[in-house]
Amino acid sequence: MPRIQVTPPPPEHSSHPQLVGDLRRELADSREFGQPLIIEEPFARTEERRVTVVWDRFARLDHEERTLVILDAYDQDQQGALPRIAVALGYTFPEGEDEGVLPYEVAPNLRSGDVVTAEQCHQAMIQLGASVLRDPQRPSLSLPTAELAKKYVDRLIAILPQSREVWTIYGNMRGACNLTFTSSARISG
């Protein structure tokens, strides 16, 4: 059987340099909370990895352009890292929820008599990067792991100390993946 080796076309680059630069800065100076959420999953037998970036700023970009933003940002951040990325996926938070990438949701479960208000809870969630794309009146704080969801609850309690009893972590096991939180908002498998 013939063996065919295909020469790849020259690489394309993103037409959104501002997003590329912002994502590159996030890669260099990862924050503990907020957007974007960067998930890096290595493949078992290679040094290649799948990179998923969940970021509401992708809302107006098609999937191909999102991939170019991710690849260009990694290329600028770490020379030589680009060939190690086998798959680069970009989602908004609602898309990540729908695709099962973010199976855990942190939400307030307010009761009458609670000291904190829904508005205070929503503002604290937005401060930590909750998405308002799906519903501006109900921020969504979805995450890839239960461990990371717990870390977000701890931070929400630090922001609103009287909210300790209102936070609930909901799990949708449909898309739960085996990821481990390592540091800041960057996840590694």
Language-model-derived ranges and their functions:
Residues 40-49, 91-97, 138-144:
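Short, charge-patterned binding micro-sites
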Residues 51-64, 141-148:
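A short interface-forming secondary-structure element
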Residues 128-161:
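Short, intrinsically disordered low-complexity segments
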Residues 33-36, 76-89, 131-136, 158-189:
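Conserved short beta-strand edge segments in small beta-sheet-based binding/regulatory domains
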Residues 32-52, 124-136:
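Short edge beta-strands and adjacent turn/loop segments
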Residues 94-103, 148-157, 175-189:
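Short, low-order "capping/linker" segments at domain edges
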Residues 1-20, 99-110:
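N-terminal presequence-like segments and adjacent domain-start helices
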Residues 21-30, 107-129:
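Short amphipathic alpha-helix segments
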